UniProtKB/Swiss-Prot annotation:
Function recorded in the entry: Involved in resistance response to the pathogenic oomycetes Phytophthora infestans and Phytophthora capsici and to the pathogenic bacteria Pseudomonas syringae.
SUPFAM superfamilies membership: Concanavalin A-like lectins/glucanases (SSF49899), Protein kinase-like (PK-like) (SSF56112)
First and last residue of the signal peptide: 1-25
Natural source organism: Arabidopsis thaliana (Mouse-ear cress)
GO-annotated molecular function: ATP binding; carbohydrate binding; protein serine kinase activity; protein serine/threonine kinase activity
Protein name: L-type lectin-domain containing receptor kinase V.7
Encoding gene (name): LECRK57
């Protein structure tokens, strides 16, 4: 049987830089992962209770497909007779697995998300520790895991010899180089996993593990491939030396020639440590005396930035770009590279040298307290997240008096420009209903991740069309986390500042100054209405009864003409059901009463047709005579152009605690 081989991820020697968060070529390295001996990928170092991840930069379309993977790897334990925890080959919906834990969680899951069906993660684990809580069979096994660490199939490490059919045991912690073969037949719905010594070039006919199951429901349309590993109180070094992916059911012969020998685990040398310590102390005293004057001047000059960022950078910092890299990428921050500007600063388009990756660079000053606050808010929230519907923060830079944030470039701009463009410029294509409906679902999915799926709750506090960006495929990504706040699950946020954009601020936020996930839902409801109607919340030039978008939609609903609220270009009969659903759901989300609004999980279920709106929804809305904008701010907005407002922050005189 012949197969068309698609070498999407070549046979690699993973040559990567060593840092907390770095990328090179096809793979992104995070946490303890770095380049090791001879350029091999080293997933961990000698740090205890740590983990490393290495994921390919480009997703692979393996849903509804057959595929074959081959990995050459080796494990070097700290102690010859006792393992650490293990490593895994991972299929992930995102590039990287944020919030993962070390030890028994293998750098894949954590205590909160382990076992959740929404993970969409499949892992082939090479486990060198028996964890009773996950039902491990022993401390030297291979397992197939779906969405959690309890294996759906597992077997002790080894292989079946083709000559005599006998099972030959292998020790994962033998420091020997081994090969792992992962082959899935979409036609037969069967996953085969084979482990064998690296010196055997042809895989045995009988697999170590076979799972008869359709894997398509667990994969998204595009899946990221990667490796994870973790250590506990005992260390181990995990090497990935070669890796190949081929389309189809293929069991290739793989002759490595001379099998490399992995170096032993580093031994502690107390004498050497004492000598180094003595030299370092001497040099430190001398350097401190010589550099004290220069250091004092530098400290005074940059005190503000260092005081706020130093601790955070050490613990959680994403990739830090040099100013030279960004200067070259944006062609010296020239005017023709400028994408936009406002109170936050300027945004420039650029291209990273040595690659074809387009980026957007936001430049702002750290002189103002607000500029520094928003800079830190972005890094501490979206800098730690990876989700297909969130704008990806690639890194940051501090140079002189300026702060820089680097994002993926979104070629189709912001949603508000697309909505405005479709009304004012007949030469531009209008958004189709299919595009609008997908945009709404994409933003809802992003908010669900922020509110309910991540380890901590993130309240965005500035949901509006201008902060929804569209990539080359018109997929929506939520951005601008400058006002975002995060807090632990189960705890209420407390704040004395009202932040957001006029018109999108929930009524209770003006009264209490307390931003919650429900205030995000309120703003999202208004965004849904704008997307369907193709207009702003306030239209001064419209007829009096049409000036306020929410009031106008409600009046049309009451008169049985709700469908007429949709923009004319999408007002086709086949779209009626979905359009009216979104309009009603938007009004429900933008309800004045906080407790009536659904959470984002319920919103997505309704959008996906899993749940339905209540039959008496109009009565619920009528009861409060819903108005989309508080009266205190409505008068201001009717007299001013909404475009003239950026993100505003008001100070409240009191704080309300509790719900």
């Amino acid at each position: 049987m012949s197969h068309k081989v698609l070498q999407i991820v070549l046979v690699l020697l993973l040559t990567l830089f060593s840092s907390t968060h770095n990328s090179n070529g096809n793979f992104l390295m995070e946490e303890a992962a770095a380049a090791g001996l001879n350029g091999y990928c080293l997933l961990t170092n000698t740090t205890k209770h740590s983990y490393g991840q290495a994921f390919n930069n480009t997703p692979v379309p393996i849903k509804n497909s057959s595929f074959s993977f081959n990995i050459i790897f080796g494990i070097v334990p700290e102690h010859k007779q006792q393992g650490s925890h293990g490593m895994a080959f991972v299929f992930s919906p995102t590039r990287g697995l944020p919030g993962a834990s070390p030890d028994q969680y293998l750098g894949i899951f954590n205590e909160t998300n382990n076992g959740k069906a929404s993970n969409n993660v499949i892992a082939i684990e090479l486990d060198i520790r028996k964890d009773e809580e996950f039902g491990d069979i022993d401390d030297n096994h291979v397992g197939i895991n779906i969405n959690g660490l309890t294996s759906v199939a597992s077997a002790s490490a080894g292989y079946y010899d083709d000559e005599d059919g006998n099972f030959k045991k292998l020790s994962l912690i033998s420091t020997k180089v081994m090969r792992l073969s992962i082959v899935y037949s979409h036609t037969d719905k069967q996953l085969n996993v084979t482990l064998l010594p690296a010196e055997i070039s042809v895989p045995p006919q009988k697999s170590l593990l076979s799972l008869n199951r359709d894997l398509s429901p667990y994969f998204l349309e595009e899946t990221y491939l990667g490796f994870t590993a973790s250590t506990g109180s005992i260390g181990a070094l995990y090497y990935v030396m070669q890796f190949s992916y081929e389309e189809g059911v293929i069991y290739p012969a793989w002759d490595l020639g001379v099998i490399p020998t992995l170096p032993p685990y580093p031994k502690k040398s107390y004498d050497r440590t004492r000598r180094i310590l003595a030299v370092c102390l001497t040099l430190a005293v001398f350097t401190a005396l010589v550099a004290s004057g220069i250091g004092f001047v530098f400290y005074v000059r940059h005190k503000k930035v260092k005081e706020v960022l130093e601790e955070w950078e050490i613990q959680n910092g994403p990739h830090r770009f040099s100013y030279k890299e960004l200067f070259n990428a944006t062609k010296g921050f020239k005017e023709k590279q400028l994408l936009g500007k406002g109170g936050f600063g300027q945004v420039y388009k650029g291209m990273l040298p040595g690659s074809d990756a387009e980026i957007a660079v936001k430049r702002t000053s750290h002189d103002s307290r607000q500029g520094m606050s928003e800079f830190l808010a972005e890094i501490s929230t979206i800098g730690r997240l990876r989700h297909p519907n969130l704008v990806r923060l690639l890194g940051y830079c501090k140079h002189k008096e300026n702060l820089y944030l680097v994002y993926d470039f979104m070629p189709n701009g912001s949603l508000d420009r697309c909505l405005t463009r479709s009304n004012t410029n007949e030469n531009q294509e209008r958004l189709t209903w299919e595009q609008r409906f997908k945009i709404i679902k994409d933003v809802a999915t992003a908010l669900l991740h922020l509110h309910q799926e991540w380890v901590q709750v993130i309240v965005h506090r500035d949901i509006k069309p201008a902060n929804v960006l569209l990539d080359h495929g018109m997929n929506a990504r939520l951005g601008d986390f400058g006002l975002a706040k995060l807090y632990d699950q189960g705890f209420d946020p407390q704040t004395s500042r009202v932040a957001g954009t006029l018109g999108y601020i929930a009524p209770e936020l003006l009264r209490t100054g307390r931003a919650t996930t429900s205030t995000d839902v309120y703003a999202f409801g208004l965004v849904m209405l704008e997307v369907v109607c193709g207009r702003r919340l306030i239209e001064r030039r419209a007829a009096e009864n049409e000036a306020v978008l929410v009031d106008w939609i409600l009046e049309l609903w009451e008169s049985g003409k709700l469908f007429d609220a949709a923009e004319e270009s999408i007002r086709q009969e086949q779209n009626r059901g979905e359009i009216e659903l979104v309009l009603k759901l938007g009004l429900l989300c933008a309800h004045h009463t906080e407790l009536i609004r659904p959470n984002m999980s319920a919103v997505l279920q309704i959008l996906n047709g899993v749940s339905h709106l209540p039959n008496n929804l109009l009565d619920v809305v009528r009861a409060e005579r819903l108005r989309g904008i508080p009266e205190t701010s409505m008068e201001v907005l009717l007299g001013l152009d909404l475009n003239s407002f950026g993100t505003m922050t008001l100070t409240n005189s009191f704080v309300s605690h509790g719900r």
